[in-house]
Design a protein with these regions (language model features):
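Bacterial N-terminal signal peptides that target proteins for export
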Residues: 1-9
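N-terminal export/membrane-targeting signals
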Residues: 12-15
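N-terminal, motif-rich segments that launch catalysis or mediate targeting to/interaction with membranes
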Residues: 22-195, 204-358
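N-terminal domain-start interaction segment
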Residues: 200
Length: 358
């Protein structure tokens, strides 16, 4: 079938920014956390409640905790090197999931977290330092691969999988496995990271990515054993539909962040049932993040299936336009994938915490 360019009208309108990516949006993260809340053993639930509700927080469960790692993106580094939590007056809706952490002590925790994890690695996606902590949300393994492996391009010691492993170690009371460009100061911080990153891990475009030449053809970074910057799509953030809404760019990555609207931001009975049907993970918990990343990478194959890419007009470096073999089929497939991945994320978050606190 001839490919046609389709406007993704159902996308969330966002600007193209490598640091703006937020798997599932806060609603999806809350769904993952809510599913896990339903599947915790009594022992794990008691630990979660105790850890999350120390200090100035009350009534925090995994559902409310899950957006925390996106809330810290409101922490801004100023030219004098100081960090401040700043509310965007033009986008007060960004603060909706962050209200459980409005107390001064919790705001200070976010500022402290960003400050400690700003320069532990260098992250300059647009030529400016954006803070190492922003790399904790993703890996960019080429979809030509069938497994997650540290030898592949698009992985690094501070990617999503490495960060999850570090948080697991902290909750287990063990040293963070080297190399360790992380500063996770306590179990509360580790649990806040896990509650969020287990959602990120199951968003296909936070693990798998396509690398493209200027004409939109797939390239393989593992052939040359290096990533050419001009081929990076930033997990689909640089793949647009060519339609601007309110002067903002629509892109493929953010479509995948947008969950089906009927799900709301809680655990539906259907998703909980699906989560209960997720097979248990074999082996030790320390091995699970890599196995789960492999599973998500294979799902990313399906997320990119039926898509084509072509250069923008006029051509722009590191920007492409998505095309579809069949738009409606793609919508239906992506909807089903999202539901399945949200269920997996919640099931595996609970499985992990249940294993830690047996």
């Amino acid at each position: 079938m001839m490919r046609t360019v389709i406007a993704l009208g159902w996308l969330v309108a966002v600007t193209l920014s490598p640091t703006a990516a937020s798997a599932w949006g806060y609603q999806g993260h809350r769904v993952v956390g809510a599913i896990a809340d339903r599947l915790l053993t009594p022992a794990a639930k008691a630990q979660v409640q105790q850890i999350l509700n120390e200090g100035d927080t009350r009534g925090i469960d995994l559902r409310k905790a899950a957006p925390w790692l996106d809330c810290v993106k409101s922490v801004v580094r100023h030219d004098d090197g100081r960090f401040h939590y700043e509310v965007d007056p033009d986008h007060l809706e960004y603060e909706v999931p962050c209200t459980p952490f409005n107390a001064a002590r919790e705001r200070a925790r976010m500022v402290d977290y960003v400050g400690r994890n700003w320069s532990t690695c260098s992250y300059t996606p647009d030529g400016f330092e954006r803070g190492c902590h922003n790399t904790f949300h993703f890996a960019d393994v080429a979809i030509q691969r069938d497994s997650f492996d540290r030898n592949f391009q698009g992985t690094n010691p501070h990617d999503l999988v490495a960060t999850i492993s570090a948080a697991i170690a902290v909750l287990q009371g063990k040293p963070i496995p080297p190399p360790f460009p992380f500063s996770i100061k306590d179990k509360k911080e580790a649990l806040l990271l896990l509650a969020h990153l287990m959602g990120d891990l199951h968003q296909p475009l936070h693990i798998g990515s396509v690398y493209l030449d200027p004409d939109g053809r797939l390239v393989d970074p593992d052939v040359a054993h290096k990533i050419e910057p001009e081929t990076e799509t930033i997990g689909g953030n640089a793949i647009q539909d060519g339609v601007a809404v309110s002067f903002q760019t629509l892109n493929l990555h953010h479509e995948w962040d947008d969950i089906p609207t009927d799900l709301g931001d809680a655990a539906t009975s259907e998703l909980v049932d699906a989560a209960k049907a997720v097979p248990p993970s074999p082996g030790l918990p320390e091995a699970w993040p890599v196995a789960w990343a492999t599973d998500t990478l294979l799902v990313a194959h399906d997320a990119f299936k039926g898509l084509g890419f072509k250069p923008t007009s006029p051509p722009a470096q590191n920007k492409w336009i998505v095309t579809f073999d069949n738009h409606m089929d793609y919508l239906q497939t992506s909807d089903a994938i999202k539901r399945k991945q949200l269920a997996k994320g919640g099931a595996r978050l609970a499985e992990l915490l249940n294993a830690i606190w047996q």
